[in-house]
Curated annotation (Swiss-Prot):
UniProt protein name: RNA pyrophosphohydrolase
Pfam families: NUDIX
InterPro entries, sorted: NUDIX_hydrolase-like_dom_sf, NUDIX_hydrolase_CS, NUDIX_hydrolase_dom, RppH
GO molecular function terms noted in the UniProt entry: mRNA 5'-diphosphatase activity
Cofactor entry: a divalent metal cation
Highest taxon listed in the record's lineage: Bacteria
Short motif (Nudix box): ranges: 46-67
Function of the molecule: Accelerates the degradation of transcripts by removing pyrophosphate from the 5'-end of triphosphorylated RNA, leading to a more labile monophosphorylated state that can stimulate subsequent ribonuclease cleavage.
Keywords assigned: Hydrolase
Alphabetized PROSITE patterns for the sequence: NUDIX, NUDIX_BOX
Species of origin: Rickettsia canadensis (strain McKiel)
C-alpha cells in the first residue's frame, strides 16, 4: 500500500458501516467533511458499537450524521469492504489504533424530505451536503476512498437504476 507505512500495516481495521442513501430521484446523499480544508465529500459512515448489528449501526449512524432516520434498508453488501487511511491521517483518527476501516455497506431509501435533514447535529461531521448522481459521486469523492466506492457502486448499481 502506498498510503500506509509498514508499522501502520500491522494495525487492524476499525469495524464500521457505510450508507448509500438514495432520495426519490435515485440521487445519493453526500456530505463535505467539516474536519478538513480540502473538498472531502463522502457518504455517511461510522463505527459499530460492541454488541450492535451492522444494520442497527447503519440506522443509528444515519440519524447521527444527517439528523434523520427516515428511511429503510434496501440491501446490505455481500461482503466487508475496507480502505486504508493515508499515513498522515492514522495518528489523527481513532487514537492511531486503526489503519483504516472495514465496512458493511447499506443501500437505504430516504423517505423524508430535504427539510428533514439536519447536519448541525451534536457532533457534526459535515458542513455542507447535497444529492449527487451516481456518475458524479465517484468524481467528487475523497481519493483514498474511491476504490471502495467503486466496489460499492458496482454491487448496488442494479438496485439503483
Amino acid at each position: 500500500m502506498r498510503n500506509a507505512s509498514k508499522k501502520h500495516l500491522d494495525l487492524p481495521y476499525r469495524p464500521g458501516v457505510g450508507m448509500m442513501i438514495l432520495n426519490a430521484d435515485n440521487h445519493i446523499f453526500v456530505g463535505k467533511r467539516i474536519d478538513t480544508k480540502i473538498s472531502a465529500w463522502q457518504m455517511p459512515q461510522g463505527g459499530i458499537v460492541p454488541g450492535e448489528t451492522p444494520s442497527i449501526a447503519a440506522m443509528r449512524e444515519m440519524l447521527e450524521e444527517i439528523g434523520s432516520d427516515k428511511g429503510y434498508i434496501i440491501a446490505e453488501s455481500k461482503c466487508w469492504y475496507s480502505y486504508d487511511l493515508p499515513s498522515f491521517l492514522i495518528p489523527k483518527l481513532w487514537n492511531g489504533n486503526f489503519r483504516g476501516q472495514k465496512q458493511r455497506w447499506f443501500l437505504i431509501r430516504f423517505t423524508g424530505n430535504n427539510e428533514d435533514i439536519n447536519i448541525n447535529t451534536s457532533n457534526p461531521e459535515f458542513d455542507q451536503w447535497r444529492w449527487a448522481s451516481l456518475n458524479e459521486l465517484l468524481s467528487i469523492i475523497i481519493p483514498f476512498k474511491r476504490k471502495l466506492y467503486q466496489a460499492v457502486v458496482k454491487e448496488f448499481d442494479s438496485l439503483i437504476q
